[in-house]
Amino acid sequence: RHLGVNWEKSTLRGGLPRIATTLQKGGVTCNVTLSLQSTNQDTLKAIKRSNLPINDFYAFKSSLHDQHLHTYTELILGLPLETYDSFAAGINQVMSPRLEGSYCIYLCQMLENTELNTEISRKAYQIETRLCKSTVTNRRYQESESQMREIEEFVVATSTMSLEEWKRAYLMGYFSIAMYNHRIAFFVMNYLRSEHGKNPIEFIEFLIDCVLENSVLFPRLYLGLSQIIQQRSLVLDGTSAMRVTDDSGGL
């Protein structure tokens, strides 16, 4: 059994481990959410957010892993003052060598009644967005177009991340999730970092270049990249932020 749990944030360092352990002992597996959103200090200041000091975050996550509690860390693509390099650095930081760890990437949304969704913020951070039919929170993705009535607004460029950089970050980010979370290159990336001092994203960027330049040599990886590129196009075209793509044996 797997239970999706929405954790109350104030329990993070207090009751959360005890609750997760109790569920685990009862035979219910659940992932513990660790939300960072960003590791870039300028970005955190802009969105008025404070995270645990990164060393405390590592220690807390490690303590959960020591109890065989699985975690996933949340990052957001498209936040103000985030750059391609700072976003990549954040992914490097959340990639744990432990099998209990994983992470996910959300696209920055312009939500009603938030400070980011004001003319002042839009102008200050030069925010460029796309309007997409709402599919992110739906559990069924086969609804007809007429059934998708809600529209969501996603950030695709800011003053510090151009549209081309956002596209690059999208491809790098979601490809890295496939390579890391599904353990396709998990051990390779950990070996390169441990033995040769190479950050995981260096390997991911190298792999993307190799696959795109030599698609015949890497057909499965190329198909996986193509699906990510297709999904990215759906966002940029304003079609959908999440849609099932054709599965022809890719990632």
Question: Can you say where each PLM-predicted feature lies in the sequence?
Answer:
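Flexible glycine/acidic-rich beta-alpha junction loops that bind and position SAM and/or redox cofactors
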Residues: 36-37, 41-48, 77-85, 97-163, ...
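Phosphate/diphosphate-binding loops
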Residues: 3-7, 89-94, 105
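Short, electropositive alpha-helical surface patch
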Residues: 19-24, 84-99, 167, 171-173
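Structured mid-domain segments that build the active-site/substrate or prosthetic-cofactor binding neighborhood
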Residues: 57, 71, 94, 131-133
